[in-house]
Amino acid sequence: ESDTSFSINSLMKLGELAQDDEGDIKTLAFSQARFATATNAEGSTTNLGLGIRHRPNDVSMVGGNVFLDYRMTDYSDAHSRLGLGGEYLWKDFEFRNNWYMAITDEKAVTVKGVNYKEKVVDGWDVEIGYRLPNNPELALFVRGFNWDYKYTQDNSGLEGAVSWQATPYVGLEAWVSNEISAVSTTLNSKLPKTDETFFGLRMNLTGSPVIFGKKDYKKNMITQMTQPVKRKYDVLLERSTGTFQNRAKSDA
């Protein structure tokens, strides 16, 4: 079973706080808003964020951000989550770290006449990326993650991805991972086993061109300053009966 999600994402410049000697942006404060829904999602997700990015020189960029993630459902009150993130880019390398923390408590919900417990799953991730110097529209990413479930085993593992900026307005990313999808909410007893692997394709259409120059690090850093933050926007929810569910690989 697969989910198809749709989202609209907007980054707004709040202020160019500093420029370099050539008049190019050096420090940027920005806000970000995103709305998403999906097949089988039972609702929608809104993300609101604030961030700052700074170029200390022509070959690097450092940034920090904070997000409020709001998961609305058609069967109960909304869930909310706080996100904190940091990023560091140097030449062809990219490093990111994000933390996701529940704001709302565990709650009782009724879905199709059945009572469950439901809560936001806390988690974190770390990502390392490498952009090919002679083909900067191509990048490779490895991301480690952990999602802290309460009534079943945690979801920990890796995601590998290949990203391709096919045109200035179209970006594609193919990925493989053992990460449980947060697009829709699944009862713990119906979650994948701990040894299962998934793959997928992401497509990003942009209104403004995204252009990377060959070994032109300054230009590439300026391009990255106005790109949406890379993080998990979907709010992962745990739905359970309140008893522990073993999802370990069976010996059979």
Predicted regions: what is each one?
Residues 67, 75, 81-108, 113-117, ...:
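Hydrophobic, helix-prone linear segments
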